[in-house]
Amino acid sequence: MEKPTSSTNGEKRKSPCDSNNKNDEMQETPNRDLVLEPSLKKMKTSEYSTVLVLCYRKTKKIHSNQLENDQS
């Protein structure tokens, strides 16, 4: 038998082959739906809806000196 050292503190370490036993099963992660459900309940709903208005300019901004050059 091995003598306990300061690094093992008397506990026997598992070798990689020992961790493949059937008793050492990994825990399954919960379904994604179950994880998202609590966060949806925490969301606050507002009384008023939010309206965003965006304006898009088709024309380029032209400097006054460029405009004069084009007209001449």
UniProtKB/Swiss-Prot annotation:
Q: Which InterPro entries match?
A: SPAN-X_fam
Segments of skewed composition (Basic and acidic residues) = 10-35
Task: One Pfam family, please name it.
Answer: SPAN-X
Give each disulfide bond as a residue pair.
none
User: Region Disordered: what ranges?
Assistant: 1-40
Q: What does the similarity note say?
A: Belongs to the SPAN-X family.
Query: What is the protein named?
Result: Sperm protein associated with the nucleus on the X chromosome N1
Lineage of the species this protein comes from: Eukaryota, Metazoa, Chordata, Craniata, Vertebrata
